[in-house]
């Protein structure tokens, strides 16, 4: 199962669709591991290719 937009996430690969990224506006620690304030959000079409490559194993 994947996460819809607005749901809390830890990694881009958890979010549904290739134009959905795990965005952390309040993550001052520079990684996706911080659980506070990270949620699936709309990404651009360039991100789509990056995510397909990164999340192939999923």
From Swiss-Prot:
Gene Ontology molecular function, alphabetical: ion channel regulator activity; toxin activity
Keyword rRNA processing: no
Record bears the keyword Disulfide bond: yes
Disulfide bonds: 2-16, 9-22, 15-40, 24-38, 48-55
GO cellular component term of the entry, any: extracellular region
Protein task: No toxic effects on mice at dose levels of 5 ug per mouse. May be toxic to insects.
Protein name, as recorded: U8-ctenitoxin-Pk1a
